[in-house]
Curated annotation (Swiss-Prot):
It holds the Pfam family KH_1. It is an enzyme of class 2 (transferase). Mg(2+) binds at residues 485, 491. The keyword Metal-binding applies. This is Polyribonucleotide nucleotidyltransferase. Belongs to the polyribonucleotide nucleotidyltransferase family. It catalyses: RNA(n+1) + phosphate = RNA(n) + a ribonucleoside 5'-diphosphate. Its EC number is 2.7.7.8. Its cofactor is Mg(2+). One of its GO terms (molecular function) is RNA binding.
Amino acid sequence: MFKVFRKEMMWGGRKLVLETGKVARQADGAVWASYGDTVVLATAVAAKAPKPGVDFFPLTVNYQEKAFAAGKIPGGFFKREGRPTEKEVLTSRLIDRPIRPLFADGYRNETQVIVTVLSHDLENDPDIVAMVATSAALTISGIPFLGPIGAARVGYKDGQFVLNPTLEQVEASDLDLVVAGTTEGVLMVESEAKELPEDVMLGAVMFGHREFQPVIDLIIDLAEMAAKDPMAIPAPAYDKDAVKTRMAALIGQDVRQAYTLTVKQERYAAIGAAKLKALETMVAEGTAPEAVASVFKELESDILRGSVIETGKRIDGRTTVDIRPIVSQVGVLPRAHGSALFTRGETQALVVATLGTNQDEQIVDALEGEYRESFMLHYNFPPYSVGEAGRMGSPGRREIGHGKLAWRAVRPLLPTKETFPYTIRVVSEITESNGSSSMATVCGSSLSMMDAGVPLPRPVAGIAMGLIKEGEKFAVLSDILGDEDHLGDMDFKVAGTEKGVTALQMDIKITSITEEIMKIALAQAKDGRVHILSEMNKALNTAREAVNQNAPRITVINIPKDKIRDVIGSGGKVIREIVEQTGAKIDIEDDGTVKVAAVDGKASEAAIKWIKGIVAEPEVGEIYEGKVVKIMDFGAFVNFLGSRDGLVHISELKNERVAKVTDVVKQGDAVKVKVLGFDDRGKVKLSMKVVDQTTGEDLSKKEEAEG
């Protein structure tokens, strides 16, 4: 019934298996891939004809993790998987980025890739095997995919690169880098590092590229057995060269003139006018509108790229290494815990840091198990930032991806929870955008956290690099504009400190990027990063000495483990009362660590005093303040140490005979008592008569001194 094709190899110490022909046979391409005990199914399906009127490639990648893969039942009311998690969105982007440039020119059929995690061994992150399976599924599908690609994860520990480290090894590694590409070159890099030098980062990229070559060979071997006939791509219904020649004669000079305008809005208006002129004239001459739109993009790209290669001058008049003017401000929002406004040319980010307690941590339910995240960074890109009116809603894939990149860039500099027990949320509102808004977020995040009093050892900055390559000639561009990103060959984002790189993200549209070009780009990025850091330092070069006055003050105390239940109380009664009475937030951990947080210092002091009173043991001979809580014929019960009560016997009320307890004290009276000792049941025996009720002086010691 099944015609199964299978290929396998040992890779990075584990067996990689690719199989097709048994599952999802109605998809154009389907590959069942396993690595260790992690199993994914990747499918690729394409529409049989292109979408009419579409001038772009409609590709969708959906990566999904099934709870059953880790032997779990989903939480929530419905007990089934819901909207994509952040991990699923990020992995979908990770798969999409290296495959998108490899589809044939002119291919416009709607294409969907679905990757499903079916088994997770809790050792290998499924993202690498998902990328490999996707590459294999596309390669055998007949879809015009000019792959295959390979992918690998690279760690770095004790001066050695590690291929496909386990989840446990990644935690201990100085580097977590994912690289993907073809036999010829690297197409995509995503990484987080602990301030590593540029040569180590480049070495990791090239190490990964070498190590995934056998995977590409394995996919080719599978395709030789199982690949379907390639899909035919219809030839354009027009003569592209003729249309391009006519358009260049008609508006070529207008487009060149438009690209001399340094203000983005003016430039876009001029380009729009040139495009409209071409459309009206050439459609009237009989050219199809879609032909005009498609060729206009090529003409625009040729003019921009040729100008940079020939003159070394860019759209806004800068040289290839110049950084746009930078203005940094901190403390721009009076009630925020930390805030910064970072402006670089026409890109601007308003970044705000907020400090919270353990109760504000994000609870993440992942396949690997539930964990708590104490650092969050959220990136928002409203339509007004590019002068447009658009939809507002939940964050899209791009916003989630940009936020995660900035999160990776800053996280290696964060203090430990032991030294800074706060939950940190950073929000970046992009208020203007013309390229490199994610790197503006990195700069603004660093400034806002230092403004909030987060003790970062050094500021962090980021820069976006670009590349234009024509034949053997190339130009590496520092601090790219939006147009240079869209029309260039590379988007290369580097973030770090003066010591080294903390995050690196690379997307390359061509396969001929050499190691030498990447080396030049990294060196140029370092120079740019150092310049940006020097500009940021003019606003704030080190963290504030204390957290902002509007932020909660967290005080950490330790109590004996056997006293935790006393502080919490039956059903949480005691801790609720402390919180309600003092206004402080209280977190108690299993090891007896207690974190008390309050904006008002007095509230924090009151809560700490209360807790210490509960856990403190009364000492014989010590004098305490207390309150009469119960009257009996034989004496009065006094609450004197947190929730602890003791008995003042009627004979210990006064230095004279007392007929009735109520003659001396009444319920609710504030009194001063001395601990005499404990009875045989452990109950505390107290005395009032040996304490001066006005001054709190120990009268028994006074008598001894006088005697």
